Amino acid sequence: MSKFIEPSVEEIKLEKVYQDMGLSDQEYEKVCDILGRQPNFTETGIFSVMWSEHCSYKHSKPFLKQFPTSGDHVLMGPGEGAGVVDIGDNQAVVFKVESHNHPSAIEPYQGAATGVGGIIRDIVSIGARPINLLNSLRFGELDNKQNQRLLKGVVKGIGGYGNCIGIPTTAGEIEFDERYDGNPLVNAMCVGVINHDMIQKGTAKGVGNSVIYVGLKTGRDGIHGATFASEELTEESESKRPSVQIGDPFVGKKLMEATLEAITFDELVGIQDMGAAGLTSSSSEMAAKGGSGLHLRLEQVPTREPGISPYEMMLSETQERMLLVVEKGTEQKFLDLFDKHELDSAVIGEVTDTNRFVLTYDDEVYADIPVEPLADEAPVYILEGEEKDYNTSKNDYTHIDVKDTFFKLLKHPTIASKHYLYDQYDQQVGANTIIKPGLQASVVRVEGTNKAIASTIDGEARYVYNNPYEGGKMVVAEAYRNLIAVGATPLAMTDCLNYGSPEKKEIYQQLIDSTKGMAEACDILKTPVVSGNVSLYNETKGTSIFPTPVVGMVGLIENVNYLNDFEPQVGDKLYLIGDTKDDFGGSQLEKLIYGKVNHEFESLDLSSEVEKGESIKTAIREGLLSHVQTVGKGGLLITLAKLSAHYGLGLKSSIDITNAQLFSETQGRYVVSVKSGKTLNIDNAIEIGLLTDSDNFKVTTPYTEISENVSDIKQIWEGAIAQCLTTQD
């Protein structure tokens, strides 16, 4: 008789306990068919987390298959802890983005901190040393105190974990809209570097080889975290605070160093982070990838307190844990290593040839499940979508007050400088950061070389909402442009798809169309998808977030020398590359004036993106340009103001466009500064101005002139977010 009091198999069926765990009636019946019997409590819990949306991608898997996943540089694509891309000289870059949205909505500090910790371990599990962190964040408007609390907690959590573990946070983006009220998006990305011969895989193979647990002792925190992340947020979600994991960056640092030492041991067979679904997902996935079975003896698992049941052990998401498979007879070598790093560790099982996932506690069987159906045969749902009616009418922007509009946009938190927040992150630890947060992309030197990795993270929402297909293309192209802007060659990308409930026809259609657009852009821009994450059911009280695909992209800079003087100077001429059109659908201007975004916008020419990108990259590397800035949120006037304010330079510009077009967000445009004495020869590049040593920012069109002090613009732009957070307290 079991020493743990749990519902019987009959009670699980009759009282539909499985529904509380996240399984539908049909899914429960499929589990019964797989087992040839009714599952017990532990088995039901295991299937519920492995078949959750968060772990199985059961609503999104068909769309993910559209993405190109191979390329000249790709060494390892989706299916492992992170993607791996060649950067030459027997080196590779390892990277991935993950969401921690639901936990951050309930417990913002720990939700964000453990999101950072988890993505770091994904990179480390491949064998790479992390070199930088990035994040993409979304919150409701800051006139709401709950949103302020969430923002403060998330930023502190990101900084608290990253700073303690010693990895710089070098890039990110933050936007604000009421559609994220109560449902923030917290997407964390990590980048690492590794030698080819050190690349690890999460596989369990070799009959008789041992399974080793290392890291924090297992507690009851985070139980059913994967299931929680697959549900809509409701008023009852606050009661699921125990589903939010607790991070310990100091143990995380020890675990990282110990793991990076363990991968140098030839006797290591496979390794995987215990992330979502904890010991369940890590062990069963390793067995599936190895074509093996596993027998875990759960009484050997290090636990934080007595009485933790097999069900709780398997579903706990206690942080800072890794699972290793090592050659039989070499266990002590690894245990001694972990003891040296003051980490708890234990041999908890072995690899078998049964292709079954067997769990025992004091010789009593608590689970006996075939590996492949558990890990690879979750049901896949293809639902019915419904096209949104696009508004093809045109709003009137002919009578806007340019100065008033300019300052309102400049101080909106989405456009305002994020330095008040980024200053809470350690941006320089490791001393290899070349370009810090706040510009187009971060650049981190590969230690001991003259190479650097450029990385960026970008999300799109309003445009995806207005036209999912075109918006999907745009988010990939935006990341591509940001890497071009620092002279990098884009290599590959990772994605995080943040959407509402796929069971709603319009949202399901958004998934269909936006991923189609993303896949097309990936193909044309030659940026294959090597890793990723899906976060669905981002809804609060029945209201969905904007569909928000996020793209993390990395690029290679073969020689960083050209960045030594890559900074705009007095006397540099300014050029605009790309046409400016009446493009206001989905823009900050449309939202400001009309209070909503629901109009169409120009389609994106991806072939033109490649042509412009290659020309600009060449000009940067030939030493012609001192700065490149993409024209983004708020349009050209805002872009020029941010350039002037960031560098404290005067600016004088004359542009032949309308007043409204100053705020147009036509895609595919760059503002570049050409070094004094140099000549720019790029098609469709128009000279628009000059950088000066004055305190004057002056932009004229045939219809208006705006002339302001740079110092005033800088004060408003840099102080807006701090003012929002202090005046509302």
UniProtKB/Swiss-Prot annotation:
Cellular component, GO, one term: cytoplasm
UniProt record similarity statement: Belongs to the FGAMS family.
Cysteine disulfide links: none
Binding site for Mg(2+) 1: 98, 533
Leader sequence residues: none
Source organism of the structure: Staphylococcus aureus (strain NCTC 8325 / PS 47)
SUPFAM superfamilies to which the protein is assigned, alphabetical: PurM C-terminal domain-like (SSF56042), PurM N-terminal domain-like (SSF55326)
Name of this chain's protein: Phosphoribosylformylglycinamidine synthase subunit PurL
Cellular compartment(s): Cytoplasm
GO MF, any single term: phosphoribosylformylglycinamidine synthase activity
Active-site residues annotated for this sequence: 54, 100
Top-level taxon of the source organism: Bacteria
PANTHER family from the UniProt entry: PHOSPHORIBOSYLFORMYLGLYCINAMIDINE SYNTHASE SUBUNIT PURL (PTHR43555:SF1)
Function noted in UniProt: Part of the phosphoribosylformylglycinamidine synthase complex involved in the purines biosynthetic pathway. Catalyzes the ATP-dependent conversion of formylglycinamide ribonucleotide (FGAR) and glutamine to yield formylglycinamidine ribonucleotide (FGAM) and glutamate. The FGAM synthase complex is composed of three subunits. PurQ produces an ammonia molecule by converting glutamine to glutamate. PurL transfers the ammonia molecule to FGAR to form FGAM in an ATP-dependent manner.
Reaction equation(s) it catalyzes: N(2)-formyl-N(1)-(5-phospho-beta-D-ribosyl)glycinamide + L-glutamine + ATP + H2O = 2-formamido-N(1)-(5-O-phospho-beta-D-ribosyl)acetamidine + L-glutamate + ADP + phosphate + H(+)
Gene name of this polypeptide: purL
